[in-house]
Amino acid sequence: MGQKINPHGFRLGITTDWKSRWYADKQYADYVKEDVAIRKLLATGMERAGISKVEIERTRDRVRVDIHTARPGIVIGRRGAEADRIRAELEKLTGKQVQLNILEVKNPESDAQLVAQGVAEQLSNRVAFRRAMRKAIQSAMRSPNVKGIRVQCSGRLGGAEMSRSEFYREGRVPLHTLRADIDYGLYEAKTTFGRIGVKVWIYKGDIVGGKRELTAASAPAGDRDRPRRERPSRPRRSGSTGTTATSTEAGRAATAVVEAPAENQEG
């Protein structure tokens, strides 16, 4: 059920990698709890920074934290003051030396998490949800490496009494194909009517042998424009038994009567 499961977890070890990379024996539960606390710390108060993802690597006495953000200037701060504050809080939380790396996301309009955050911000600012979804789809499809996108909003859309879900899709989004490079993002918009969940799936081509294969771009123009082949005609079925019209004597006699006048006209 590729349509239901988280696309990152569905493809772990195939096309996607873990966001926490370390090994532990007896301290496994403590490290997982610590990773959740690190991500929660970076999420609070950094909404304007546009954080796409946080990757964590551990050694025996050091923790490496990579922050992928669309606005690195907000995370770094003036003369690195904000980065120093974040590093100090992380060292206090983990009790170890922290190596903080701030990496810029080159194409934020093709990053699913950042697209979801952008739609959620518009919903919080009372923008119509359909308009916000269409605008996000149009800006994402302008990127050359995006082959398809799906945006879904769930909750009390437009202040309705009953919550519902609506989605828009453009291009291909093959969620059950394991070799497909699917980027997934989830964010919640806080509105006066309650929370609205925003989910975004972005298809960026197939990954074959560790390399991304852009199926639409690599296919020749003749293959894309080729018309679909028509299926061969099947014999007619009659009755509930599924027998064909020519498998019984009555059926053969009826078809012979129909075909005879056509032969006379040709003669």
From Swiss-Prot:
Taxonomic lineage from the root: Bacteria, Bacillati, Actinomycetota, Actinomycetes, Mycobacteriales
Quaternary structure note: Part of the 30S ribosomal subunit. Forms a tight complex with proteins S10 and S14.
SUPFAM superfamilies assigned: Prokaryotic type KH domain (KH-domain type II) (SSF54814), Ribosomal protein S3 C-terminal domain (SSF54821)
GO-annotated molecular function: mRNA binding; rRNA binding; structural constituent of ribosome
Name of the protein: Small ribosomal subunit protein uS3
Region (Disordered): 215-267
HAMAP family membership: Ribosomal_uS3_B
CDD domains: KH-II_30S_S3 (cd02412)
Biased composition (Low complexity): 238-256
